[in-house]
Amino acid sequence: MEDGCSHGAVRLEEERDENQSSSNIDFQPSKLGTKEYWDHAYERELEVFRESGDTSEVWFGEESMDRILNWLEKHDIPKDSAMLDIGTGNGVLLVQLAKAGFTNLSGIDNSSTAVELAKAVAEKEGIFSLKLQVADFLNPMPYLSHYEICIDKGTFDAISLSFDNPAEKLRHYHQSLLNVLKNGGLFLITSCNWTKQELVNHFNEGLELLEELLTPKFHFGGKTGSSVTVLVFKRKA
């Protein structure tokens, strides 16, 4: 599960009350918030990969991966840092991280087909060091712990579009993140559904905003909008 954008429209930063609790933010439920949708999507993608060796488009575009990689390089993040890709999907982000020299990379997805695809993609690229597991981040296994960096590129968005009690699932996500991220660890999140302030409000317990990464902004009608928000949080000690 990677990208849960509810729409492709530009999101106005002034659209919602910046002090509104995430539990009160009501997105229209979507098939993008269901496991069945992603199982079917990755079944199709795996079939295409087996036939042609090609993966589908990178969610949020390749610039989303470049943005993360550039930030990690800029801040001299140690290459052996334990990293977890939450909802790894086809595993392309982990492959790019491995190519950049990072050596302690893990990825989870609740779709077994996604994990199968990610393993196939990594193998094709000659990368055999990735630790890939089928796991539901909302109900993490005991081995999911003590990561120095966690990355989310669309999974939090998808969960917010669930038909079944999304507010509770988002709270579980937050708690799971606090459980697996080391004190002082970093959380990088890319979202197309949530504004900066909404994400800060949601993750304010146990996490502090470290930086907002630059993304394209749009100005119209006297307002500012964006299609994606990328934030870096730090786990409080």
List the predicted regions and their residue ranges.
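N-terminal auxiliary segments of SAM/dcSAM-dependent transferases
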Residues: 1-40
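Conserved alpha-helix/loop element of class I SAM-dependent methyltransferases that forms part
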Residues: 58-81
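Class I SAM-dependent methyltransferase SAM/SAH-binding core
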Residues: 82-84, 89-140
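A short acidic, Gly/Pro-enriched loop at the edge of an enzyme's catalytic core
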Residues: 138-150
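A short glycine-rich, Lys/Arg-flanked "PGG" loop and its adjoining helix->strand segment in the class I
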Residues: 166-183
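Conserved beta-strand signature within the Rossmann-like core of class I S-adenosyl-L-methionine
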Residues: 184-191
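Class I S-adenosyl-L-methionine
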Residues: 196-237
